[in-house]
Regions:
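N-terminal Rossmann-like or analogous alpha/beta NTP/dinucleotide-binding catalytic cores
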Residues: 2-135
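Active-site cores that bind ATP or allylic diphosphates and position pyrophosphate for catalysis
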Residues: 112-247
């Protein structure tokens, strides 16, 4: 019997999960757990590139793991863990950093974007973020890494680092491939349906841990349009189309 391919995905403990995260990603992850050998890591070390309150970060990390299980990720079928609990992530990151070129990191578009948004907090940790990500992936000999378009460049860098290391020490690391799973529904804001549902806009965002009465209130206030017709038309009727997608 052919061995299952291994999937690694790291998720930052950024807070409560939303309806968008569930329909856009988590439902698909649940469907992958029978076909692949899946590792899901709460990457709390990545999260500290932005200032954190340690107690809050620990609480969110544990709470997020619990929510994944509640959404259907079976701990008997998946390995789920917190990044900082495995010191080999940081250890391997240092080793891989010695095989990573400064110019490669300088070209990372996500670093450039985040540096613009957080100009007062451009740290070495933010700059070397992709090296720690490579360590996360390579440590477990991962075959596939589920990514969005904004992370593809990081997987390519990971492959380059692994290839360079393997040239010195043959067959050490498996070369991972970017994996684009079946796309989930793209859920938009209830208040601004032209924008993706985001935690930064609480009134337009449904959190999985919201009380039933709060969920009802948010949907009752959801933006629609002045027409009487109910039909799916993302361009001309984004509000109605978003509600139909959720339904």
């Amino acid at each position: 019997m052919e061995a299952k391919k291994r999937i690694f995905s790291g998720i930052q403990p950024s807070g409560e999960l939303t309806l968008g995260s569930y329909m856009g990603a988590l439902k698909n992850w649940v469907s992958l757990q029978d076909e692949y050998d899946c590792l899901y890591c709460i990457v709390d070390m990545h999260a500290i590139t932005v200032r954190q309150v340690p107690a809050d970060l620990r609480r969110r990390s544990v709470a997020q793991l619990a929510q994944y299980i509640a959404c259907g990720l079976d701990p008997e079928k998946n390995i789920m863990f917190i990044q900082s609990h495995v010191p080999q992530h940081a250890e391997l990151s240092w080793v891989l950093g010695c095989y990573t070129q400064f110019g490669e990191l300088s070209r990372m578009t996500q670093f450039k974007d985040k540096a613009k948004k957080h100009a007062d907090n451009i740290t070495a940790g933010l700059f070397t973020y992709p090296v720690l990500m490579a360590a996360d992936i390579l440590l477990y000999q991962s075959d596939l890494v589920p990514v969005g378009d904004d992370q593809r460049q990081h997987v390519e860098l990971c492959r380059n680092i692994a290839t360079r290391f393997n040239n010195w020490f043959p067959d050490t690391f498996t070369l991972p491939e970017a994996f684009v799973p079946k796309m989930g529904a793209r859920i938009m804001s209830l208040g601004q349906p032209e924008n993706k549902m985001s935690k930064s806009e609480p009134d337009g965002c449904v959190f999985l841990m919201d009380k039933p009465e709060d969920i009802m209130r948010k949907f009752k206030r959801a933006v629609t349009d002045c027409e009487t017709a109910v039909r799916y038309d993302q361009q001309n009727k984004p509000g109605i189309s978003n509600l139909l997608t959720i339904y």
